[in-house]
From Swiss-Prot:
Record's signal peptide: none
Localization of this protein: Cytoplasm; Secreted; Cell surface
One Pfam family per UniProt: Enolase_N
Biological role stated in the UniProt entry: Catalyzes the reversible conversion of 2-phosphoglycerate (2-PG) into phosphoenolpyruvate (PEP). It is essential for the degradation of carbohydrates via glycolysis.
SMART domains given in the database record: Enolase_C, Enolase_N
EC number: 4.2.1.11
Active site feature: 205 (proton donor), 335 (proton acceptor)
Residues involved in (2R)-2-phosphoglycerate binding: 163, 335, 364-365, 386
The record's free-text note on cofactor binding: Binds a second Mg(2+) ion via substrate during catalysis.
UniProt family annotation: Belongs to the enolase family.
Protein name: Enolase
Gene Ontology CC: cell surface; extracellular region; phosphopyruvate hydratase complex
Organism encoding this protein: Kocuria rhizophila (strain ATCC 9341 / DSM 348 / NBRC 103217 / DC2201)
Name of the gene this protein is made from: eno
Phylogenetic placement of the source organism: Bacteria, Bacillati, Actinomycetota, Actinomycetes, Micrococcales
């Protein structure tokens, strides 16, 4: 049993050049852990509060020195002397000090940074890799990389409404092969875009962000890239979407592809897409508060495609419990900074898995070189990870960590592949 003896935080930069929080934890046996907190561009209304300084003269108000001070001056006091291996007790002490439902007092960025750094220090003390420390001996499933290779919405300056167009290499035998397949399609897509005189500039998450006439045009380009790379759409590599529909929802209607649409019209649109394209997953197809629309959509196509709640659930066990009760969605997107502590993240995953909901572990658009989410994906045997295109080092860092984990697991490693999407039958 190793005791926490110190916490120290600092302000660093994320992949978009915005400040974020990094925390270091030190234990009495000399063990050390460091973690950095991500930040989102399209954020759910019900996410835990990310604490920013608000001084417009410094980093345009996005500084995080208040959160840094919260770690150094407040959180450290309540965790020093605690057993680092008792993650629930550590996180509970910090949550009680904050005392709010959404971490508004101290900031989710302060609490999460401390939570992850302490877990890393405890793993080091136990002489275990983080995935095995968090997940135990049964942690062995390598996730399908949901690679965001084409960006629209708030991740790009284009007239494509859907925020992310992803590929999922479901037919690969191993994670390393899946990664290779995805990389080859990514480069193939770049070549297709160049041939058409389209932009190969990158969005926040490393995907290309060309100005296209429609969402269907984006899907067609990706199918062409899959073919050009020598793979079969649907059998080898499937498609997935993050619609982020709360970004274009207002007063009960969706402004999508230049038209005002109802939830019923949006549902019909997605049902049609599922028929036409080899889609395995659609994230946030409807607004975060459109519970009725979500229930109808789930009933309509939930047996054909994975419907993922991101802004809908915000990794919050209470919102997820409501979704389960009302038959809404069939999968949970897991973002550690939406809820703001490792314990609450694992509680949400456990609730989802117990009720037959799939889990997709996810990065944010503002990332760092921190690789904790790669270890979490294996720790909980999620079978799916969303961490951007195979470009930009803050994205690739997670893929490289998964390669290391696969190598370390050896013959015990299993690649989730098509089994990650039991509702999908390849056409």
């Amino acid at each position: 049993m190793a005791m926490i003896i110190a916490l120290q935080a600092r302000q660093i930069l994320d992949s978009r050049g915005n400040p974020t929080v990094e925390v270091e934890a030190l234990l009495d046996d000399g063990s050390f852990g460091r973690a950095a907190v991500p930040s989102g561009a399209s954020t759910g209304e019900f996410e835990a509060v990310e604490r920013r300084d608000g001084d417009k003269k410094v980093y345009q108000g996005k500084g995080v020195l208040d959160a840094v001070h919260a770690v150094d001056e407040e959180l450290e006091q309540v965790v020093v002397g605690l057993d680092a291996s008792d993650q629930r007790a550590v996180d509970q002490a910090m949550l009680e000090l904050d005392g709010t439902d959404n971490k508004a007092k101290l900031g989710a960025n302060a609490i999460l940074g401390a939570s992850m750094a302490i877990a890393r220090a405890a793993a080091s003390s136990a002489d275990l890799p983080l995935y095995k420390y968090l997940g135990g001996p049964n942690a062995h499933v390598l996730p399908v990389p949901m690679m965001n290779i084409l960006n629209g919405g708030s991740h790009a300056d284009s007239n494509v409404d859907i925020q992310e167009f992803m590929i999922a290499p479901i037919g690969a035998p191993t994670f390393s092969e899946a990664l290779r397949w995805g990389v080859e399609v990514y480069h193939s897509l770049k070549s297709v875009l160049k041939d058409r005189g389209l932009s190969t500039g990158l969005g926040d998450e490393g995907g290309f962000a060309p100005n296209l006439e429609s969402n269907a045009a984006a899907l067609d380009l990706i199918l062409e890239a899959i073919d050009k790379a020598g793979y079969k759409p649907g059998r080898d590599i499937a498609l997935a979407l993050d619609v982020a529909s709360s970004e274009f929802f207002d007063k009960g209607t969706y402004t999508f592809e230049g038209k005002k649409r109802s939830a019923e019209e949006m549902s019909a649109y997605f049902a049609d897409l599922v028929e036409k394209y080899p889609l395995v997953s659609i994230e946030d197809p409807l607004d975060e508060d459109d519970w009725k629309g979500w229930a109808t959509l789930t009933e309509h196509i939930g047996d054909k495609v994975q419907l993922v709640g991101d802004d809908l659930f915000v990794t919050n066990p209470e919102r997820l419990a409501r979704g389960i009760q009302e038959g809404v969605a069939n999968a949970l997107l897991v973002k550690v900074n939406q809820i703001g502590s490792l314990t609450e993240t694992f509680d949400a995953v456990e609730l989802a898995q117990r009720n037959g909901y799939r889990c997709m572990i996810s990065h944010r658009s503002g990332e760092t070189e921190d690789t904790t989410i790669a270890d979490i994906a294996v720790a909980v045997n999620a079978g799916q990870i969303k961490t951007g295109a195979p470009a930009r080092s803050e994205r690739v860092a997670k893929y490289n960590q998964l390669l290391r984990i696969e190598e370390e697991l050896g013959d015990a490693a299993t690649y989730a592949g098509a089994s990650a999407f039991p509702r999908f039958a390849a056409k």
